Amino acid sequence: MSTPFWQSKSLEHMTEEEWESLCDGCGKCCLHKLMDEDTDEIYYTNVACSWLNSKTCSCKDYPNRFTSGEECTKLTREDIDDFTWLPHTCAYRLLAENQPLPEWHPLITGSKSAMHAAGESVRNKVVYEIDVVDWEDHIQNLPDRLKPHN
């Protein structure tokens, strides 16, 4: 059996198809983040982009996400050094930090079911930006399993 591509290739050398398949579809990228102006610390909220389908954890207009979702961030190979803002469970970040993919990752399990069962997606855990008055009320504390591994 051959070595999985994510273990044998650097992020820079992956094909577009391989790159896209790294995304586990958790939906955490689609949550709004707030930055502390004094410390530059990033805080995750449970406030989702209006384009996120909270049941499937995917964009309602994925092919056009960079034009229809003006705040949607495109992850590129050129930005690898800046991936520290990504969730600590994100494959792009993990591989950039030379860490293994989590055991529930769809590339390992073959489906998103294990990710949802492990509670690693935003499925049914979000509110939409249109319904939010005070965004700071929606800051989420990261559980220990999502904190940086040192």
Curated annotation (Swiss-Prot):
Top-rank taxon, per record: Bacteria
Listed InterPro entries: Puta_zinc/iron-chelating_dom, UCP006173
Assigned protein family: Belongs to the UPF0260 family.
HAMAP family: UPF0260 (MF_00676)
Protein name: UPF0260 protein VIBHAR_03078
Source organism of this protein record: Vibrio campbellii (strain ATCC BAA-1116)
